[in-house]
Amino acid sequence: AGFSGLADFVFAMQGLGSGTISLFGSAEMQSKYLPDVRTGQKIAAFALTEPEAGSDAAALTTTAKIEDDFFVLDGEKTLISNGGIADYYTVFAKTGEAPGTRGISAFVVDADTPGVEITERIKVIAPHPLARIRFNKCRIPLAQQIGKGGEGFKMAMATLDIFRSTAAAASLGFARHALDEALERVKSRKMFGSPMSNLKLIQAKLGDMSLDIDASALLIYRAAWTKDNSAEKITREAAMAKLFATEAAPTCYRRSCTNFWWIRCGFRIRC
């Protein structure tokens, strides 16, 4: 993770798209979709966010109604990572079993299903694309529903909890890489007749980076340990790990670039 933005694509995005199936899908569904994702032959995507339903995921308006032996999906999703290149989407839609979050279900929708339309490819600087997707009378078999009806919101939150920890772990790798580069620099470059590493101010800055890195690691390991010990929810632990680690990583890179590698990391501007 410390050397490539692909960590975001491979761990967070590829895993996020298939995570709900791993956690809640039937054995048949898992055997159908997961092997090709695991080998990298197919790409998965997680379709929850909508134009008017971001953090308030329960406000989504995409619907899935039963007609004969099919669910018919109608609605729009946006800011979908891997959108436009994914082979299938894990889609969350209202099925109406109950009001609010208890009326949301989860489905697997193959990208080549009639009615799946990529309406916008969102321009971003990222290792994976983002897109807006419309489901226009998209018919899928009843067997494409993940788990029980009405439990989609709970599935989405459980999946996000795990991959918040994954995003935090990737950020930890970035931060450690920044520290490794800084240590290499201060040991090899001399100032005032001795290596930079002998300067107290430099040692303090390296200490700050190490503190952020170790704190990130401990929060991440706590979230993982809690989940491994059968906790039903790790929302608090995962959110704390992601918040701290994703803020620590750019801070460590900024310290590394501005204090030790300003020539390598900077840009030359001709006025």
Range-by-range predicted roles:
Residues 40-48:
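A short, Trp-centered hydrophobic/proline-enriched beta-strand micro-motif
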